[in-house]
C-alpha cells in the first residue's frame, strides 16, 4: 500500500500552495504520534476529560427481541456527546505543539464543531467553525453551544448549504492562511495525511472494544457502524480488519430511497472521482459534477467517503448497505423504548440494520453496534420529522 493511498484511493489533490502545510502536518503527526510525552498528555485528556474508556453495553432487551447478543459501544457517553472528541482533542493538541494559534473545522451535525470548539477552549486556541446554513438551522442547539464556548460560526450559503459546502469553505479558508491556521478535519476524509491521522485517533474505539470483548470472553461476529465521511466506522473497524471472521458492515444514508435522487449512499451509488483533495467514491453525474445529497441526518449527507472505506468496499472486506430516513427514525424510537437510550440520528442508521440482518442469521451471533453519538442535538429534527418537515 502506497503511503498516501488505500489501494487506489486517497492521495493529495490540492493546489501546490497546500503541499507545504500537508508535509508539515505529516511530519508533526509522525513525530508526535510516537512521542511518549504527547501520548501521555493525550491519554490523560481522553481518560479524565473525555471520559474514556466508554462502556461496551449489553443491550438485554434488544438481544431478547432479535434473539442475538447485541452490544452497544457507547461513544454517546463521551464528553460533548459523540466520538468526534477523540479526534478533535488530539488534533487540537497537535496544533498547539506545532505552535499554531488558530484552529478551524467543518461540521455537519455540529458534533465535530462542538468537539473542536471544546478542545480549543480547553487548550487556549482561537476557533472558527464552517457550517452549512441548512445545518445551522437544523442543529441550532449545537450552534449555540459552540458560540458559548467562544467559537465563531460561519454559516455557508452556497449550494445545498450542508456538509460538502462547509468542507469546501473550510479548505478555502485554510489555504488562504496556511501558515497560521490548523485545519481540524472531522472525518477520515481529505488529502493525506488526514484520513490516516483521523483513523489513528479514532482507532481507540476499536482497541477498547476488542479488549472489552476479550474480558467478556466473547468473539464478535458482526460490527455495524454508520458511515458519512467514515470516522466512527473506521475507528471501530480498524483493529478488526485483519480478522476475517469478523464481518464489518457500514451503513450509509438511504434518505428517501437509493433509487431516488434523495440519498447519500456514496458507495452503493457512487463512482470513482475527486472530492476535497482525495480520490475516492463520489456521488457525481457523467460529467463529474457532484450530485446533491439528502439525509434526515446532518452528519451523513456527504457526497464522498473516506478512502479507507472505498478500499474496503472495492476489496469486499466490508459490506455497505443503505438505511432510509424512515427506517432510521423507527430504530431511534425502538432503542428509546427498549433500552432507555436516545441515540443520534446518525447512529440510528446503524441500529436500524439489526432489523434486516438478524432474521437472516442461522446461528446465534454476537453483534456490536457503534453508538457513535447521543440524540440530544436531534430533538428538534425528530419533532420536525414527525410533522413532515424535510431538510436537505
Swiss-Prot record:
<protein>
    <recommendedName>
        <fullName>Tryptophan synthase beta chain</fullName>
        <ecNumber>4.2.1.20</ecNumber>
    </recommendedName>
</protein>
<keyword id="KW-0456">Lyase</keyword>
<keyword id="KW-0663">Pyridoxal phosphate</keyword>
<dbReference type="GO" id="GO:0004834">
    <property type="term" value="F:tryptophan synthase activity"/>
</dbReference>
<keyword id="KW-0822">Tryptophan biosynthesis</keyword>
<dbReference type="InterPro" id="IPR001926">
    <property type="entry name" value="TrpB-like_PALP"/>
</dbReference>
<comment type="function">
    <text>The beta subunit is responsible for the synthesis of L-tryptophan from indole and L-serine.</text>
</comment>
<dbReference type="GO" id="GO:0005737">
    <property type="term" value="C:cytoplasm"/>
</dbReference>
<comment type="subunit">
    <text>Tetramer of two alpha and two beta chains.</text>
</comment>
<dbReference type="InterPro" id="IPR036052">
    <property type="entry name" value="TrpB-like_PALP_sf"/>
</dbReference>
<dbReference type="InterPro" id="IPR006654">
    <property type="entry name" value="Trp_synth_beta"/>
</dbReference>
<keyword id="KW-0057">Aromatic amino acid biosynthesis</keyword>
<comment type="similarity">
    <text>Belongs to the TrpB family.</text>
</comment>
<feature type="modified residue" description="N6-(pyridoxal phosphate)lysine">
    <location>
        <position position="84"/>
    </location>
</feature>
<dbReference type="InterPro" id="IPR023026">
    <property type="entry name" value="Trp_synth_beta/beta-like"/>
</dbReference>
<dbReference type="Pfam" id="PF00291">
    <property type="entry name" value="PALP"/>
</dbReference>
<dbReference type="InterPro" id="IPR006653">
    <property type="entry name" value="Trp_synth_b_CS"/>
</dbReference>
<comment type="pathway">
    <text>Amino-acid biosynthesis; L-tryptophan biosynthesis; L-tryptophan from chorismate: step 5/5.</text>
</comment>
<keyword id="KW-0028">Amino-acid biosynthesis</keyword>
